[in-house]
Amino acid sequence: MKKNLIISNVRGSKDITPECMHIWNYVETKIIKIVDSYNYKEIRFPIMEFAKLFSKAIGDDNIVVNKEMYIFLDKNKHELALRPEGTAGCVRSCIFNKLLKNNITRLWYMGPMFRYERPQKGRQRQFSQLGIEIFGSDSYSAEFELISISNRIWKSLNINKHVYLELNSIGNLQERQTYQIELKKFLLIHEDKIKKFFLNDITKNPIKIFNTNNKYIKNLLKQAPKIIDSIGINSRNTFFYLCDILKNLKIPYKINPFLFRGLDYYNDIVFEWMSKEINNTKIAICSGGRYDNLVKNMGGIYTPAVGCAIGLERLIMLVSSLSKEIKKKSSIDICIIPINIKIEKEVLIFSEKLRDIFSYKLRIKVDNSQKNFKKKLKDADKLGSKIVIILGENEIKNKQITIKNLSTRKQYTLYIDDAIEKIKKIFTKNIQ
């Protein structure tokens, strides 16, 4: 084992250090506030499940299951997997806990997912997603609601001009089978050229070819038959009803006839929010779609459903690159600096009294380091502290404290009760 291997990141994973957490907290808070306003409830479920759950939900021949999942045996020889996506685990939890009743159920969740992929910018082996799911609605209003929520999230983060919405309808299972026959005919005509760049069997699951990044094949596929021509009147009408309401509410979109989601449980409407701001390549920030048969396929009662997931690392990369004005939130509001160690006990008692008065609404730090006073003052300034409270033996003896406002550089020595009133005035907005 290499000397430093034990403290290195596992390839494809990243630490989020305290100086980066402010933007994560900022983004997550914005998202949760909007999702909550639509009356979605948070659900939490394990990051590991029985591996069969994902092969049942996603399909044994899907690349996520047969190549990208982290699978291991526990001590009882049970085959477990780290979750590669959230929908399957959410559905399992809903069935197990009997959450899916006759009414519409709205849920959201957030946490790490795991896929063994080649790490690159915007793609990691451990990545975070925020998932939003609606169970029990067969109306296009459910798709619209998820698109509307995500659109409001982009606006709240000031990135709405840097993302765009792509839509498609992939029809029901029977309609997709009809389309695959037409697509297969087209691909077999060009089989010799395709085989140079695409090693998979194009006759087995021809739709998978739309996942390729090869430029030659992508250009060739522009001539391929479109699935919209193979879907029935009901699927077509539902799709265009959604397009119509998006137009009415001025949410721009683009119909992408070759948009197919990578997971096999989707049917009818699928969508992706894309951006070209990361890596100068087209990359999905949010993906979603309808999966009416998944709950029943996993052992529950038939429950139509729609969901989407936001890739948080990608979203945060985008927000960070575009919103330079998002400043690091002040680490502390008040820094208490004792002049010497002799009064440490009195300082700690005072700091706890201050926390009681402000009911945890202010962030208060006691600097009990061995640094000299000037360095402590400098550190408080670096941390963005608004005020410094200076306590020495004289202050303790006279029941006074010295307040230094680091914004105005003004300094006051006041009796404790007067000083607390002064602090309240300085932090009026924080403590309301």
UniProtKB/Swiss-Prot annotation:
Which molecular function term from Gene Ontology is one that the record holds? histidine-tRNA ligase activity
Q: Which CDD domains match?
A: HisRS-like_core (cd00773)
Q: Does the keyword DNA damage apply?
A: no
* Name of protein: Histidine--tRNA ligase
Record text on subunit structure and interactions: Homodimer.
**Gene Ontology BP, a term:** histidyl-tRNA aminoacylation
Q: What are the entry keywords?
A: Aminoacyl-tRNA synthetase, ATP-binding, Cytoplasm, Ligase, Nucleotide-binding, Protein biosynthesis
Question: Per the record, what is one GO cellular component?
Answer: cytoplasm
Similarity remark: Belongs to the class-II aminoacyl-tRNA synthetase family.
Q: Signal peptide: which range, if any?
A: none
Q: Which reaction does it catalyse?
A: tRNA(His) + L-histidine + ATP = L-histidyl-tRNA(His) + AMP + diphosphate + H(+)
Q: Where in or outside the cell?
A: Cytoplasm
What enzyme category does the UniProt record give? ligase
Q: Which PROSITE patterns match?
A: AA_TRNA_LIGASE_II
Q: Which Pfam families match?
A: HGTP_anticodon, tRNA-synt_His
Q: Which InterPro entries match?
A: aa-tRNA-synth_II (IPR006195), aa-tRNA-synth_II/BPL/LPL (IPR045864), Anticodon-bd (IPR004154), Anticodon-bd_dom_sf (IPR036621), His-tRNA-ligase (IPR015807), HisRS-like_core (IPR041715), HisRS/HisZ (IPR004516)
EC numbers for this chain: 6.1.1.21
- Originating organism: Wigglesworthia glossinidia brevipalpis
> According to its UniProt record, where is this protein mainly located?
cytoplasm
